[in-house]
Amino acid sequence: MSQRGRLLWSCRRGMAELDRVLALYVHGAYQEADVSERQAFERLLDLQDADLWRCLTGLARPEDPALAALAAKLRALVGQAAC
């Protein structure tokens, strides 16, 4: 399985909303991301669904600055996709 395929598989969560947001990132911004952002994305995927949802909706802010920045980037991507 390719790295992209593995990531998309890891993006399959218990919530369709999370699936869509995470896949949007993999299909777009992930390819241009630097190594540290890619590592942060993989750490983000390690979060439980409820914690990930709170981070991506802005209800919680991760202590890890890289995860907080990535969550903000994902929120911005969703905003751009909605326009």
From Swiss-Prot:
Subcellular location: Cytoplasm
Gene3D superfamilies tied to this protein: Flavinator of succinate dehydrogenase
Taxonomy of the source species: Bacteria, Pseudomonadati, Pseudomonadota, Gammaproteobacteria, Methylococcales
Keyword Cytoplasm: yes
GO BP terms, alphabetized: succinate metabolic process
Organism: Methylococcus capsulatus (strain ATCC 33009 / NCIMB 11132 / Bath)
Pfam families in UniProt: Sdh5
Family: Belongs to the SdhE FAD assembly factor family.
Key words, A-Z: Chaperone, Cytoplasm
Entry GO terms, CC: cytoplasm
Name of the coding gene: sdhE
Role summary: An FAD assembly protein, which accelerates covalent attachment of the cofactor into other proteins. Plays an essential role in the assembly of succinate dehydrogenase (SDH, respiratory complex II), an enzyme complex that is a component of both the tricarboxylic acid cycle and the electron transport chain, and which couples the oxidation of succinate to fumarate with the reduction of ubiquinone (coenzyme Q) to ubiquinol. Required for flavinylation (covalent attachment of FAD) of the flavoprotein subunit SdhA of SDH and other flavinylated proteins as well.
Protein name: FAD assembly factor SdhE
